From Swiss-Prot:
This is Dephospho-CoA kinase. Catalyzes the phosphorylation of the 3'-hydroxyl group of dephosphocoenzyme A to form coenzyme A. GO terms for cellular component: cytoplasm. NCBIfam families: dephospho-CoA kinase. It is an enzyme of class 2 (transferase). Pathway: Cofactor biosynthesis; coenzyme A biosynthesis; CoA from (R)-pantothenate: step 5/5. It comes from Bacillus licheniformis (strain ATCC 14580 / DSM 13 / JCM 2505 / CCUG 7422 / NBRC 12200 / NCIMB 9375 / NCTC 10341 / NRRL NRS-1264 / Gibson 46). Belongs to the CoaE family. ATP binds at residues 12-17. Residues 4-201 form the DPCK domain. The keyword Disulfide bond does not apply. It catalyses: 3'-dephospho-CoA + ATP = ADP + CoA + H(+). InterPro entries: Depp_CoAkinase (IPR001977), P-loop_NTPase (IPR027417). PANTHER family: BIFUNCTIONAL COENZYME A SYNTHASE-RELATED, DEPHOSPHO-COA KINASE-RELATED.
Length: 201
């Protein structure tokens, strides 16, 4: 029986690091961000709809979508942002479910759905258990400012654009505290996998 684990966190909480740890354990990780990029490539249904909805002005000379230009349009206009989400999100969901179900059919013990905005998108129903990668707010802020070269206000705006980590923590089945060393984080992950290996769905 396959246990489907939802993996989420906040910006700069270290979720990608934990996703890599799952992969190092030989566990399939279905990455929503990677799929979102694939979903808008030429020849995909979402690509066609974006070109029709937003016009050829959002296409590069190669025919690929100009992500920067599209980003500028949707961040400046809430209605356009919702339009884009309505095109892309259903396709991403479909592709994620397909990859999840392939892992289940293959009889894998675990499969991880790595979804940054899992709760915000209401996708927890696709999983059996949810892990939130958590760090204290001060550390999240410090890491984000350093990683993205942002000032404090810019970093805070990005953090507040998502549901707070403490809120996600309350809703999760398990929390990995990523404020210590990588070794600490890895130990928590292995402990969880050991515990969940013994449960039936």
């Amino acid at each position: 029986m396959t246990l489907v684990i939802g993996l989420t966190g906040g910006i700069a909480s270290g979720k990608s690091t934990v996703a890599q740890m799952f992969q190092q354990c030989g566990i399939t990780v279905v990455d929503a961000d990677v799929i979102a990029k694939e979903a808008v490539e030429q020849g995909m249904p979402a690509y066609q709809k974006i070109a029709e909805t937003f016009g050829e002005g959002v296409l590069l000379e190669t025919g690929d979508i100009d992500r920067r230009k599209l980003g500028e349009i949707v961040f400046a206009n809430e209605e356009k942002r919702l339009q884009l989400n309505a095109i892309v999100h259903p396709e991403v969901r479909k592709m994620m479910i397909k990859q999840r179900d392939e892992a289940i059919r293959a009889g894998e013990r675990f499969v991880v759905l790595d979804i940054p905005l899992l709760y915000e998108s209401g996708l927890e129903h696709l999983t059996d258990k949810v892990i939130v990668v958590w760090v204290p707010m001060e550390l999240q802020l410090e890491r984000l400012m350093k990683r993205n070269r942002l000032n404090k206000d810019e970093a805070l705006n990005r953090i507040h654009a998502q549901q707070s980590l403490d809120e996600k923590k309350k809703r999760a089945d398990a929390v990995i505290d990523n404020s210590g060393s990588l070794k600490d984080t890895e130990a928590q992950l292995h402990q969880l996998l050991d515990t969940w290996s013994n449960i039936e769905k």
